[in-house]
């Protein structure tokens, strides 16, 4: 049974998150996307936890579904209890800022974790709480509370808040998690890296690489995801596959093109400076406009820690895609949130779920279903025939199947290069 999972999202109780991130809306969007199992996000927040208990009911072991009396239709979506925790602390003489994704087997485990954390930390102010605790100590607390929990370092390359982040991360897993390192089974790529980039680190050779959307609004669900082939859809089976890196059951991940991630290249957003690692080296990591340190992006950081060449043998494969809304927007040359894009997106996903359109439907059927340019864009995205302007310092990159968005992005980059030449 093909199962598509997106474990990392946020609720309406997190900062800068859509009010549409609530159980029934999430369930409806998950079905439109073709997502089978969706993380709840934010289980540490009392308000969100209360809402989850009120609106969800047990389904398969460790999974939940919307209550039938609340949802208009019998939902096929399953929820798994998840949260992202932000650890900010000092270790080995440096400030560390690490985000951890946590999967929990049931509400009892969640309540025990929350009870432990609430003694020392404020869980009310943000769905993704900021905790002044060493990531190692937090992992130990959670695993001692319930060993069935799964702890996954989130978006491990993001400069500011991640395990390997250039600004406040570590160089090795062991430096962060010490003796618990063998119990950290999986690592999340984040939008600015793909599995190939992670394969360049030998310390990740025996670890599972997963990908999730980190969605802050319903339409962003599934922009990255994990595809399993499971005989039994349960919490224990999902976590077993992840822990064991079971390649027979873990079929592939769905990825952003990493250049679209907002920290792929180095740069300085305020000065509109975007640089490749080679260009950054020439400028000695200093912004050529304001002469302040550049934000070192994911590609550069991977290069600095890499100790082996890319080898796909024995790895869980991946497929790079462009979200359907973005393809439609690119083809129609209108904003992704425009009415024209919304209408076409809703029309197409009434016929098939988005993932089926992006991954499975034949070119012939796509041409009968959609505008020929949209069909071509989907096929081009599948085959990697796209143009790319990398993101940098919090600015999303541009991935285009038509070249229209790319041309605009290249013009902006060219202006930045000309500006560099003045200093």
Task: Cite the ranges covered by each PLM segment.
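Histidine-centered divalent metal-coordination motifs
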Residues: 8-12, 155, 216
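Low-complexity, acidic/Ser/Thr- and charged residue-rich accessory regions of DNA metabolism proteins
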Residues: 328-423
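An N-terminally biased module of ancient metal coordination in phosphate/nucleic-acid-related enzymes
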Residues: 1-95, 386-387, 399, 404, ...
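Histidine/acidic-residue-rich catalytic or RNA/ligand-binding cores of hydrolases
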Residues: 15-18, 49-53, 161-168, 199, ...
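Short acidic/histidine-rich active-site segments
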Residues: 207-223
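Divalent metal-coordination and catalytic microenvironments
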Residues: 8, 42, 79, 102, ...
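Extended substrate/RNA-proximal surfaces in nucleic-acid metabolism proteins
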Residues: 2, 50-185
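Cys/His-rich short segments
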Residues: 250-316
């Amino acid at each position: 049974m093909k199962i598509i999972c997106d474990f990392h999202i946020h609720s309406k109780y997190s900062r800068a998150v859509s009010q549409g991130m609530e159980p029934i809306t999430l369930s409806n969007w998950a079905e439109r996307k073709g997502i089978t199992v969706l993380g709840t996000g934010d289980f540490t927040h009392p308000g969100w936890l209360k809402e989850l208990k009120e609106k969800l009911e047990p389904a398969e072991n460790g999974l939940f579904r919307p209550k039938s009396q609340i949802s208009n239709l019998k939902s096929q979506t399953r929820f798994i209890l998840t949260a992202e925790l932000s650890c900010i602390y000092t270790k080995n003489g440096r400030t560390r800022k690490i985000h951890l994704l946590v999967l929990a087997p049931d509400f009892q485990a969640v309540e025990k974790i929350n009870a432990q954390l609430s003694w020392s930390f404020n869980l009310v102010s943000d769905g993704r709480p900021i905790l002044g605790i060493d990531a190692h100590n937090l992992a130990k607390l959670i695993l001692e509370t319930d060993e069935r929990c799964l702890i996954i370092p989130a978006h491990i390359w993001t400069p500011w808040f991640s395990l390997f982040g250039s600004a406040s991360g570590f160089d090795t897993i062991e430096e962060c998690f010490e003796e618990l390192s063998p119990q950290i089974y999986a690592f999340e790529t984040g939008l600015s890296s793909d599995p190939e980039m992670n394969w360049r680190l030998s310390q990740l050779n025996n670890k599972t690489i997963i990908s999730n959307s980190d969605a802050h609004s319903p339409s962003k669900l599934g922009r990255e995801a994990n595809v399993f082939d499971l005989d039994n859809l349960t919490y224990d089976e999902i976590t077993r596959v992840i822990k064991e890196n079971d390649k027979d059951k873990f079929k592939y991940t769905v990825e952003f093109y990493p250049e679209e991630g907002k920290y792929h290249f180095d740069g300085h957003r305020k000065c509109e400076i975007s640089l490749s690692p080679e260009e950054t080296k020439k400028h000695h990591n200093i912004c050529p406009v304001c002469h302040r340190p550049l934000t070192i992006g994911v590609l550069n950081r991977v290069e600095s820690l890499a100790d082996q060449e890319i080898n796909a043998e024995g790895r869980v494969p991946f497929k790079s895609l462009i979200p359907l809304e973005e393809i439609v927007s690119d083809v129609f040359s209108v904003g992704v949130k425009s009415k024209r894009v919304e209408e076409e997106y809703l029309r197409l996903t009434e016929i098939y779920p988005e993932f089926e359109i992006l991954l499975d439907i034949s070119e012939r059927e796509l041409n009968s279903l959609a505008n020929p340019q949209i069909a071509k864009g989907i096929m081009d995205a599948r085959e990697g025939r796209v143009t790319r302007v990398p993101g940098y310092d919090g600015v999303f990159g541009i991935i285009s199947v038509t070249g229209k968005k790319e041309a605009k992005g290249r013009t902006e980059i060219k202006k930045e290069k000309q500006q560099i030449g003045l200093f």
